[in-house]
Each structure stands twice: as structure tokens, then as C-alpha cells.
Amino acid sequence: MIRPLLPEEYDRVMYIWLYANIEAHAFIPADFWRDNFDKTREMLPEAEVWVYEDEEDVCGFIGLTGDYVAGLFVAEEYRGNGFGHALLAHAKSLHRYLQLNVYEQNLRARTFYEREGFSFMERHWDDATRQYELTLNWQS
């Protein structure tokens, strides 16, 4: 079931956020994600966040600010079950256009977004992580 994030679930989604980022971005020091943990948590109430709940456990979430996908994360133990696809499909049902950034080296995420109909827009350098990012967009 997909539903809005509840404040009492902030710790769970931040746990998913931290460990998914560390696992998916081995090319970025883990301390980068740890150092940005509190800042990201503070932004949760300002974002449109939807969670995928399965048997009363939050398995993943998608965070949006307007038409921008700030993040899509699924807990490792729930990957491969279509939860990421379902969360993105939900966001697509609410928006006619979506944009996101993905690290160039994150091949799994790039493949996922391309399969979901996202197209390449531009490549740019992220000073904070010292990595190239790709901007992708989707339009209905």
C-alpha cells in the first residue's frame, strides 16, 4: 500500500535513506551521507513523501519537491519486489512531468529510470560529492 509518510516513521525512512545511499554509492565516502543525515531529516516535513507499506513495515519511499524526485529508496531486504516501480508509478499518477538527478556511476539506478521512461537531459559536476550527475526527465 502506498500512502503519505507519517511523522513517527521519519526514523525508519532515514534509516532506509542512509543505508541505501551508502550501498548504492560506494564511490562516495560513507561519511558524506552520515554528515548530511540531520539536514535531510529536517527537510522531510517540507517534502511530499510517499511510503510503500507491506505488512505494516515501511519498505521504501519516494520524496518529491514539486516535480523533482528528491529521492527514491527501497530497503535492501525488499528490493526486487516492484516497490520502487510502484512508488514511481504513484508519483507519475500525480505529476505530468518529473525530473531527477542520478550519479553517473550509479548504473543500477540509471538502468531503472531508463526502463521507467526517463530521458537524459544533461550531465553536470556535483562539487559536494566530486562526482558527475545526470539530470533525467519523464513526461506523460
Residue map of PLM features:
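Conserved active-site alpha-helix within GNAT-family acetyltransferase domains
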Residues: 85-86, 105-122, 126-133
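Conserved GNAT-fold acetyl-CoA-binding loop/helix
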Residues: 10, 15-40
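Conserved beta-hairpin
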Residues: 48-60
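A short helix-loop-beta-strand connector motif used in the catalytic cores of GNAT acetyltransferases and
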Residues: 39-51, 68
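Conserved acetyl-CoA pyrophosphate-binding loop and the N-cap/start of the following alpha-helix
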Residues: 78, 82-90
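Conserved GNAT acetyl-CoA-binding A-motif
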Residues: 93-105
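A short, internal acetyl-CoA/4′-phosphopantetheine-binding micro-motif in the GNAT/acyltransferase core
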Residues: 68-79, 102-103
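Conserved N-terminal entry element of GNAT/NAT acetyltransferase domains
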Residues: 1-8, 140
